[in-house]
Every structure is written in structure tokens, then in C-alpha cells.
């Protein structure tokens, strides 16, 4: 089910499991929320018996299926706003404990989320440990620095 966070960012959420022991926030790859994540959210909720939410990484943008506009949009992303969205998604799950899982660009944001105590466990798949040159900007911190400094 699609919801809108207080920030205005869209998420796919599944809270159908009764009394979940834990919640899971998913940070998608550069291709954003799509059918793949709708299925993944539902599947992980059912198989792992938890509340699950996937967060749109490019809120308010229509980037299309090509990768070039997406690469060009990454420097415009703001680490603080992205972390806020991940926190709001965690709150929407309604569980005391929440993990964070990310894929590729979302995995990089998992590393950047190490500065927060909100997530009990963080799992990054293929996340960049340094910001690629074409993505660097004043609003993009270095993942290794966030991991190092917490």
C-alpha cells in the first residue's frame, strides 16, 4: 500500500503482520520505488513476519526509466532530508525496533545512516563507500566518514 510520509515522500508499506517483532525500512536503488519493491515489501513482511516500508529516494521528481537523469539528480539529494525520510518511514511502521536495508545507492544511504541510533541493524547490499565523483555536492557526505564517526 502506498502512503505519504509527513515530509511528502511516498513509501510502499506493509503492516499486515499482527504483532510484528521488528520493522524494516528499505532504501531502494537509483531506479526508485517500482513493482520490484512493492513485491519485495510484501514478501519480506510475510516471510519475516515484520512490518516493512520502502522509501522513494527521489521525492517529487519524475525521472523516467533512463539512468542518466537519475545520475544527474543524485547531487541534488540531501543527506539530512533522506535520513529524515528513513526515520519517518521507521515511525510509520509502529514497531519499537527497526532495521534498515539498502541496495546500491540505497546501500550507500544505509552507511550514511550509521550516524543515527534509530536503526537497530543496518544491512547494505552493494552500497558505495565513497560518493562517486559525479554525485558529489555540498549536501552529500562521505559514507565512510559517517561510519567512522557514527
Residue ranges: model-predicted function:
Residues 132-150:
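The feature captures the conserved acid-bearing segment of alpha/beta-hydrolase catalytic domains
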Residues 39, 112-113:
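Active-site signature of alpha/beta-hydrolase-fold catalytic machinery across serine-
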Residues 102-106, 110:
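Gly/Ala-rich beta-loop-alpha elbow adjacent to hydrolase catalytic centers
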Residues 1-94, 143:
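Serine-hydrolase catalytic machinery in alpha/beta-hydrolase-like enzymes
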Residues 44, 113-114:
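Aromatic pocket-lining residues of Rossmann-like dinucleotide-binding sites
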Residues 61-65, 129-135:
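A short beta-to-alpha transition loop/helix N-cap that caps and shapes the active-site region
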Residues 118-130:
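A conserved short beta-strand
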Residues 100-102, 125:
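Short beta-strand immediately N-terminal to the catalytic nucleophile in serine-hydrolase-like folds
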